[in-house]
């Protein structure tokens, strides 16, 4: 943990109505005396001159002083709010540096200091960056929920429950006379099952929070001339892809980023899949499979005029066999305007099958609702929180340890091994909030922040 005094511009670079310089550390009060000539009253806005070492006025504006630990970083903090011209702000930072013992802050260092001083935990610190980077209203709302501690609260409750159960198991092992057959009396099993159920709910919420932040990647795949590019255009609401009657028109990957009621969706149109001797087309098909293998969902486009089948194993078994085993597939029977099929959804052999006309737009709205449901969309997400991929990985790791602990309890009645799995679960959960986190991870997280945050 650094004890340096740091300074940075807190507002975006460039011209603006207001520009803010933020200073945090022991020398913040020295800066106030040097630049303002006095120390402003704590937590009061003070309109004054910002002066150079020779007494010349650099700018005029509002000075705010926050005495640590009652500040964002937990240290003494001084904010100088002046005019937003970049030259003026650069002059002001240069003046602050003249005080001595002050350096320019690294990206995210103010938030890192707040984390180190227990003003917020790691999920709250990450939520600051997520709030700034939010690309939709729902993402902003969810990031604010995380900033206010909604995600942290869920994780802390889980950690407390796991810790209490672990202590009970270890105490029963150390003092066997106090609890006879403690592993088979049902108390531990019931407590463990409740924790597993609670973690399942948190995982589901975190997965949705991750989708809100990062979006779901949906790849449109199928044979040439099945209508893939027409579907991309219909979902995007604009002519993003060239559409012709010539099979193989699309030879490269096309991407569109849209929002469905605040839920970000990454739509990928790919080259038609077929055997070909055309070198350029072969490259496009290889890229298509790369996108399919990293997708969250595949929309398998079928030209409804070529087959009446609905089961993808019947339509194209080689395609289905090559798909990753855990990849979800939605079958899209296209060209319903030509086949006369009813625009409806059915479940066939575990697959959702939609009949649409990408050309006319018939059935596309129903498909959008399907995609929203896959993303876990709810009309009221006021209690939702934002989540990152590392959070999902930590929750998955914690869930794995709980399942191993459950096996040790149910199959082997191994109290010591159950206690160890609970300890590992506790560590995985605590890494989410930063209670137990490596310096490398902290550096990676905070380095992605804006300077001045």
Curated annotation (Swiss-Prot):
Species of the source: Shewanella baltica (strain OS185)
All copies of domain TrmE-type G, residue ranges: 215-376
Gene: mnmE
Annotated HAMAP family: GTPase_MnmE
Keyword Phosphoprotein applies: no
GO cellular component: cytosol
Protein name: tRNA modification GTPase MnmE
Cofactor note (record): Binds 1 potassium ion per subunit.
Entry's EC annotation: 3.6.-.-
Transmembrane regions listed in the UniProt entry: none
Function field: Exhibits a very high intrinsic GTPase hydrolysis rate. Involved in the addition of a carboxymethylaminomethyl (cmnm) group at the wobble position (U34) of certain tRNAs, forming tRNA-cmnm(5)s(2)U34.
Single GO BP term: tRNA wobble uridine modification
Binding site for K(+): 225, 244, 246, 249
Cytoplasm listed as a keyword: yes
Record-linked PANTHER family: TRNA MODIFICATION GTPASE GTPBP3, TRNA MODIFICATION GTPASE GTPBP3, MITOCHONDRIAL
Positions annotated to bind (6S)-5-formyl-5,6,7,8-tetrahydrofolate: 22, 79, 119, 453
Pfam families: MMR_HSR1, MnmE_helical, TrmE_N
Keywords, alphabetical: Cytoplasm, GTP-binding, Hydrolase, Magnesium, Metal-binding, Nucleotide-binding, Potassium, tRNA processing
